[in-house]
Amino acid sequence: MDEIENIRILIHEVASEVDTIANRYKKQSDIPQVERRILVRSIFAFFEAIAFVLKSSALMTNPVVFKPEEIALAKEEDYELSDTGEAQIRKAKLRFKPNLLFAFQIAAKANQINFKLSVNCHQWDALIRSIKVRDRLTHPKKSEDMTVTEKEIEDVQMAYEWIFDQFGLLAMMGLSKILKEKKNSQKTSN
């Protein structure tokens, strides 16, 4: 399987998982706690997949526009010295929020389009609140930490829909640019 097909399958799988859980119930209040937790985790898996896809596709599209540190971060690589003094690569530990912002920025840069994920909107605020829910579920300290409220489900679903839309918008802007360039090159060759 080539890298493009892997990316397509990855996005399809994580989005399908979210949709399966989210669409199973008519009302959010009907979603049992265990499935609320699964939904939050699945949505964050989707966010991580989107970040990976944006960074991978950016490197495939136009790697020459990036600085070495951008390439390393896009590959999620860090470097260290072994006990014998040899340089070696290790997996970078990237914080969620800056990594997501970076993924959108590097994808826009690769496609040379003017796009920036807005951090001044209520959807971004919902995403930030959702990060706290994800963190609480991932590192529970008391039984109440495992409860996901209806408001928290609303936030995480709003963040999901927004990131999904932003991903689509970025893709459409990139495609539009490609089609415009193709049309212009056909005009100049005629």
Predicted feature descriptions by range:
Residues S56, M60, T147, G168-N190:
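Long amphipathic alpha-helical segments
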Residues D145-K151:
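Short conserved catalytic/interaction loops centered on acidic-Pro-aromatic/His motifs
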